[in-house]
Design a protein with these regions (language model features):
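Beta/alpha (TIM)-barrel catalytic core signal, keyed to glycine-rich beta->alpha loops juxtaposed to Asp/Glu
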Residues: 1-144
Length: 144
């Protein structure tokens, strides 16, 4: 239970507590009723699943968003998405690197794991902390 995790945190047994896949209404409820709010909420988040409302709520609650599927699990042809590929080509990056950058630029921590990341190297991601890329600033689901 959440209370047990709060106790572990308060006793120094764990360094952080968080949740996974909490919808905005559930996260708001937990944040209002918990002694210690969650520090992170892991959700599927990538250009085709943007989670705008959830991201807004996480920011309001002071919860760090974390994308557990920043590559859409390699599904829906995401690595061949025309816009992602065009942006990547402009900056000399792969579609995978563009997807990581998109999340990081929005303040989202990323976990590039699983089969999709094994098939798609993401080395050389130091570009993640460079200036904001204008093409990604206004990315919406409608442009994907």
């Amino acid at each position: 239970s959440w209370r047990a995790m709060e106790e572990l945190y308060e006793n120094g047994k764990i360094r952080a507590i968080g949740v996974c896949n909490f919808l905005p209404d559930r996260l708001i409820d937990l944040c209002r009723n918990a002694s210690i709010p969650p520090m992170v909420n892991q959700v599927e988040m990538h250009p085709l699943c943007q989670q705008k409302e959830a991201l807004d709520v996480m920011r309001e609650c002071g919860v760090q968003p974390q994308a557990w599927a920043p590559f859409a699990e390699g599904m829906r042809g995401i690595f061949k998405n025309k816009l992602l590929c065009a942006i990547g080509q402009k900056y000399g990056k792969t579609a995978a690197q563009v997807m990581l950058r998109w999340n990081v630029q929005r303040g989202v921590a990323v976990i590039p794991t699983g089969n999709a990341s094994k098939k798609t190297p993401v080395s050389g991601i130091s570009f993640l902390m460079n200036r904001i890329w204008k093409p990604l600033r206004t990315w919406t689901k409608d442009t994907a």
